[in-house]
Amino acid sequence: MKMKFIFSAAAIALAALSAAAQETPKAPEYEFTTVKENPITSIKNQYRSGTCWCFSALSFVESEILRTKGYELDLSEMFVVGKSYRDRAVKYVRLDGHLNFAAGSSFGDVFHVLNDYGIVPQEAMPGFNYGTELPEHNELDAVLKGYVDAVSAKPNKVLSTAWLRGFDAIVAEYFGEYPETFTVDGKEYTPESFREHVGFNMNDYVNITSFTHHPFYEPFIIEVCDNWRWDSAYNLPMDEMMEVMYNAIDKGYTIAWGSDVSEKGFTRDGLAVMPVEETKAAAGSDQERWVGKSAETPQEEVKAALPEEMVITQEMRQDGYDRKTTTDDHGMHIYGLAKDQNGTNYFMVKNSWGVTGKYDGIWYASDAFVRYKTINIVVHKDALPKHIAKKLGIK
């Protein structure tokens, strides 16, 4: 009798599960059709480092070189990261530690490094002088922060003449020495002459954002910790910022994109959407930090809500920024435009988490997500629609 009861209970449970499965709607499958796709270089992997700002901005620069020169290059991220850390250390000590000193930074940081120090190919400075084949910076970040904090405390009451040399020595041990010269296609270059060879000019690029706490059509310093160089961005209404992005892709340009990615709609499966249902921000940086440790992270509830997205307003953008639900989490590289089977627009995004996910390292970010969660973008000034360039006084 007891055995019969167990079997009966099991049968009832199985029947209930079967009924529930029949009632649960199948998660939709997205079918993307590419509208416009501009050239990009290969997918890279920032791995265990907070250097998305460098990977994404250099990816953008590589696409610009492809567009203007036809050269397909792999530029050294760690050349840029090392130079950036040094500049930040100097400023941090000058300000007695009253500055953000961490792994994160901004697109403008990359442009300043290229302008001030030049650039080298990846093979000239891989930056893996610590026993791994991918970036792992937790130890380095902790060491450098501890070092600059100790220096800033001035235990000798006056700074020594050795502290910056000591900082440089730490960076060199992890990244290797900066090459003074190197050879590409049989020709010798310095970092500065190679920058001239590839034709990069930081004055050709425009930083754009959209917030209401500063006047539109004027530049302001975006108040985020990673903007430690205090670079300015031109402030446009949201619709005009989006117009710049669509125009850039249509005219053959790509876009450096800084965005919040803590939303539930930013998934492991290569999607970035804003479901109508209220979403909760996730804790965490980079792939594990933003979308979970494993592919087993449940996404069914997100997928089920995807077909209907929020209608984003300028006020919603501002509220997210003011309440810190929209922050400068992650830098990526937008290079194309696609539509799903319902005709919804998606920007095609090159990420820096390696060849991973459903689309092999590419994400599809919906118009709604980009409107809501963009912190800033960088584009070539010629990508601006003429009427917007005129409003900004850009020629």
Regions from the language model: what does each represent?
Residues 1-23:
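Bacterial Sec-dependent N-terminal signal peptides
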Residues 2, 60, 122, 342-343:
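Short amphipathic alpha-helical segments with coiled-coil-like heptad repeat character
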Residues 22-26, 295-297:
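Short N-terminal helix-initiation segments at or just after the protein's N-terminus
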Residues 27-256, 357-359:
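Active-site nucleophile-adjacent alpha helix/oxyanion-hole segment immediately C-terminal to the catalytic cysteine
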Residues 165-395:
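Active-site signature of cysteine proteases
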